[in-house]
């Protein structure tokens, strides 16, 4: 049985008179109006369907025989929606609904035996009526989550209480999933997941907790929830490149992954490699990278054999033009190295440290600094020491060159400390590499001098030929002139 459809929508705020007159209002003016408004509503109602609420008796004052019927009446009363974009309309009814929702939250939280089978339908109907709606497009088409303030839901005074009631309902000792599954089904969950695209971070925070509770209590919905999150992420990566609730969904996934049974199913491994790793290419990575990295590390703690393909995947998608992303990638690599098995480290040390060597050489000091901080990690240092014969030859040239040439003195100081540490790990190899590096530099200088000499000779030869050509031309002209004179 699917969840009931929400009631008719509530009326939207009218377009301003200035915008009616001039459809091409200057962008700066429209932006100022948006910033001033800062609230939006996705719930609308036609002007002809005004509803006035009347207060019902308090549940605590009703007899035990009357309470259940009164409880259902209050749930039905709370299905009425109001236009919060109009701050002066329906004030009395809005306050009655707010007080009723508060009473329902307290009633479900403090009383046992109130969530009976007959109430489930009205409870889910009230929740659906209030929270399920089509989210409006962003007020700001150029909305940047990292810089711009989000548009907050104007009807939050009511919606917040509905979410609180929903959570108390799910967490109640009287809650029975076997009954609730008739109403909280795949359609209900699909609508819930769509709400994660809300711009309001308060709503997404409630949704995160609600979905996590549903995942925990409804075993039959778990595979469906994972599949739908997978679909949202794939659309985000390959189609829309925009979804407000990515961080919250990843946070839920982190907890889900932590509970995966071993050995991991093929579908879970595929999700890691085909969805989570490609998500590192997203433009707004900074908004959800912490949660994404946590999910990746959770997978590696479950199955260490995934370490090699994960690191190779990160190296494949390594940022080439965004230093901020490089710093994030380096942070994630350190988190992975914190949990890596020594046997797995040997498989990826060469390609990984080639990339770290490039980062150390970066002219962007934050990238170089973040890469050099690896040498402050005791466990990573122990892995480097065990494999110094492979790692030192990869890193040496970059480190030695930076110690002489980098523009940032902080980086130079860090490099000296790293070189000192590496020298203590294997002094003989360090000396051999120093000698080889200096000899190579001498050879390069010699080749450079030879190239310069060659170019000099070529220029002289070219000049000589030009002079000869000029002389020949002059001689020919002289011969023609003398012949003409005769």
Swiss-Prot record:
Pfam families registered for this protein in UniProt: B56
Compositional bias (Low complexity): 38-51
Molecular function in Gene Ontology: kinase binding; kinase inhibitor activity; protein phosphatase activator activity
Keywords: Acetylation, Centromere, Chromosome, Cytoplasm, Nucleus, Phosphoprotein
Modified residues (N-acetylserine): 2
Tissue/organ expression: Widely expressed with highest levels in thymus and ovary.
Record flagged with keyword Ubl conjugation: no
Residues modified as Phosphoserine: 41-42, 49
Region Disordered, residue ranges: 22-52
Compositionally biased intervals (Basic residues): 27-37
Tree of life domain: Eukaryota
Stored Gene3D superfamilies: Leucine-rich Repeat Variant
UniProt similarity note: Belongs to the phosphatase 2A regulatory subunit B56 family.
Function: The B regulatory subunit might modulate substrate selectivity and catalytic activity, and might also direct the localization of the catalytic enzyme to a particular subcellular compartment.
Protein name per its UniProtKB record: Serine/threonine-protein phosphatase 2A 56 kDa regulatory subunit alpha isoform
Species for this entry: Mus musculus
UniProt gene name: Ppp2r5a
């Amino acid at each position: 049985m699917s969840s009931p459809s929400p009631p008719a929508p509530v009326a939207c705020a009218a377009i301003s008179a200035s915008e009616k007159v001039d459809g091409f209002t200057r962008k700066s003016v429209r932006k100022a109006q948006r910033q001033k408004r800062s609230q939006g509503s996705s719930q609308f109602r036609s002007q002809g369907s005004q509803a006035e609420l009347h207060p019902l008796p308090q549940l605590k004052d009703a007899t035990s025989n009357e309470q259940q019927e009164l409880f259902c009446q209050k749930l039905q009363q709370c299905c009425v929606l109001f236009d919060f974009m109009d701050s002066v309309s329906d004030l009395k009814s809005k306050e009655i609904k707010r007080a009723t929702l508060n009473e329902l939250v307290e009633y479900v939280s403090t009383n046992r035996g109130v969530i009976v089978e007959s109430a489930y339908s009205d409870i889910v109907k009230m929740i659906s009526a209030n929270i399920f709606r089509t989210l409006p497009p962003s007020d700001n088409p150029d909305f940047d989550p990292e810089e711009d303030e989000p548009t907050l839901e104007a009807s939050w005074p009511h919606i917040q209480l509905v979410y609180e009631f929903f959570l108390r309902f799910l967490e109640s000792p009287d809650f029975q999933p076997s009954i609730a599954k008739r109403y909280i089904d795949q359609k209900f969950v699909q609508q819930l997941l769509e709400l994660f695209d809300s711009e309001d971070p308060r709503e997404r925070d409630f949704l995160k907790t609600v979905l996590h509770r549903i995942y925990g209590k409804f075993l039959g919905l778990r595979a469906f929830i994972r599949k739908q999150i997978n679909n949202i992420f794939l659309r985000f990566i390959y189609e829309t490149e925009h979804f407000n609730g990515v961080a919250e969904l990843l946070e839920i996934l982190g907890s889900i992954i932590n509970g995966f049974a071993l050995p991991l199913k093929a579908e879970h491994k595929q999700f890691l490699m085909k969805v989570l790793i490609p998500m590192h290419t997203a433009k707004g990575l900074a908004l959800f990278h912490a949660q994404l990295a946590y999910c990746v590390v959770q997978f590696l703690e479950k199955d260490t054999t995934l370490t090699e393909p994960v690191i190779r995947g990160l190296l494949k998608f390594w940022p080439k033009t965004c230093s901020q992303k490089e710093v994030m990638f380096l942070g994630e690599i350190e988190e992975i190295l914190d949990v890596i098995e020594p046997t797995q480290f040997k498989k990826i040390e060469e390609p990984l440290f080639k990339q770290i060597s490039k980062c150390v050489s970066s002219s962007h000091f934050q990238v170089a600094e973040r890469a050099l901080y690896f040498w402050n990690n005791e466990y990573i240092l122990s892995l480097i020491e065990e494999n110094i014969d492979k790692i030192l030859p990869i890193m040496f040239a970059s480190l030695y060159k930076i110690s002489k040439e980098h523009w940032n003195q902080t980086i130079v100081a860090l490099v000296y400390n790293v070189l000192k540490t590496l020298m203590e790990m294997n002094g003989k190899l360090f000396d051999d590499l120093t000698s080889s590096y200096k000899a190579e530099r001498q050879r390069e200088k010699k080749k450079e001098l030879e190239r310069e000499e060659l170019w000099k000779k070529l220029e002289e030869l070219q000049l000589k030929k030009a002079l000869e050509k000029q002389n020949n031309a002059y001689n020919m002209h002289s011969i023609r002139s003398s012949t003409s004179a005769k």
